[in-house]
């Protein structure tokens, strides 16, 4: 009898060993692609493996495809860290006449992210300290996209109109307290749409940033007519962000180019040298080739490429993050620099260095891109059109080791969708 039990135990043990040996080491391998990982200075053919807890496990040549549950065929394609769009508006809701705060003009993220390679968005001030928890419950906690946020220095958030001019609702202490409470989600503070000729919102946002652990401020300079040089050379700390870099012009908002000569203002480079971050924030009417062409000819490309994605920009000259990247490709920005501006650089700016790179242990977010050659047009809100010879297209988007988007079925086996969440 004991002998029978021993034999049965041996059989069961051997079955367990076989099951363990048959269990693949990785959840997914992205195989045969040209990897561009700016943090780690990788720019060559490599394979990327993601483990079963959704973290980067290896970036090596010739990883055995049999060691993964799924394999993405990336031959002829570019493989990058998951794209970070650092300027979006996602506080969608049903309140009328509230612009981008819990209203119709903002967009739920998932329908506009994975299909263009975006795995992380940073909402740029749609909510303030009074409204952030509603935004968290309504959007952040329910999205498949990773949603982080700049908190508006205006407590009510980005309602448009008079509330955004209310100095009494710009409370540095209460804003900082909310950022500290949700320091896993709030990455900085936003100033926007302010039209008075004073520095109140910027001073209070910077104060809040210091109180909340020295996190950055991002500024849409509104229509106050104040000096861009003073903002970037005196007010800003290293790491603070100027958005809508290639927009503006006129008396209400200074541009980075001189209106008389059309040339780049010298202080722009000086501000970069002291640590100021220059963000595209394309938007519906905040990007003009009349500024971008002379700036890029002078060698002034953006630190961060972002969209300012909302209902008014998504079907205009902006469209999506890939289209904005295409504009800078057409303007002569090198591919690795473009990838850096939507991956590792924004991750550093928002102090989330587990994102935007393919280091072992980082989040298993990967974007697979095709660079298609041909004739392609890009244009700005003023109707100026440029023609390019290549453009980015998204083939596959992986977030946390799960395939959330696959344009042409390059994943084998293709994931089944269970309850709206792709299977591992």
Question: What function would you assign to each model-found segment?
Answer:
Residues 65-66, 71-141:
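Metal-associated gating/positioning segment near the N- to mid-region
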């Amino acid at each position: 009898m004991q002998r029978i039990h021993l034999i049965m135990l041996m059989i069961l043990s051997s079955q367990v060993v076989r099951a363990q040996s048959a269990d693949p080491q990785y959840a997914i391998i992205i195989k045969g692609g040209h990897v561009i990982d700016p943090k780690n200075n990788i720019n060559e053919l490599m394979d990327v493996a993601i483990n079963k807890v959704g973290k980067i496990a290896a970036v090596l040549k010739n990883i055995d495809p049999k060691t993964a549950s799924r394999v993405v065929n990336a031959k002829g394609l570019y493989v990058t860290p998951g794209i970070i769009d650092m300027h979006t508006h996602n506080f969608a809701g049903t309140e009328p006449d509230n612009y981008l705060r819990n209203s119709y003009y903002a967009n739920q993220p998932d329908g506009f992210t994975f299909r263009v390679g975006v795995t992380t968005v940073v909402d740029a001030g749609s909510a303030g300290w009074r409204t952030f928890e509603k935004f968290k419950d309504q959007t952040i906690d329910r999205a498949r996209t990773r949603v982080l946020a700049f908190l508006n220095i205006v407590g009510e958030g980005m309602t448009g109109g008079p509330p955004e001019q209310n100095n009494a609702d710009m409370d540095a202490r209460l804003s900082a307290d909310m950022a500290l409470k949700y320091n896993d989600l709030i990455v900085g503070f936003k100033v926007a749409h302010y039209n008075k000729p004073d520095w109140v919102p910027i001073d209070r946002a910077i104060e809040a940033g210091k109180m909340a652990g020295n996190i950055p401020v991002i500024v849409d300079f509104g229509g106050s007519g104040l000096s861009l040089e003073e903002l970037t050379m005196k007010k800003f700390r290293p790491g603070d962000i100027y958005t809508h870099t290639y927009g503006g012009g006129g008396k209400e908002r200074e541009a980075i180019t001189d209106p008389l000569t059309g040339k780049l203002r010298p202080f722009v480079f000086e501000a970069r040298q002291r640590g100021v971050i220059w963000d595209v924030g394309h938007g519906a009417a905040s990007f003009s080739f009349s500024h971008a062409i002379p700036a890029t000819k002078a060698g002034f490309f953006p630190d961060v490429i972002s969209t300012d994605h909302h209902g008014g920009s998504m079907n205009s000259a902006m469209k999506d993050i890939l289209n904005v990247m295409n504009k800078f490709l057409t303007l002569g920005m090198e591919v690795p620099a473009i990838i850096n501006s939507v991956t590792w650089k924004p991750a550093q700016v928002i102090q989330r260095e587990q994102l935007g790179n393919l280091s072992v242990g980082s989040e298993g977010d990967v974007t697979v891109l095709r660079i298609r050659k041909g004739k392609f047009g890009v244009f700005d809100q003023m109707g100026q059109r440029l023609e390019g010879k290549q453009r980015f297209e998204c083939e596959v988007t992986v977030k946390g080791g799960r395939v959330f988007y696959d344009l042409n079925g390059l994943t084998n086996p293709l994931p089944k969708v269970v309850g709206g969440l792709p299977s591992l």
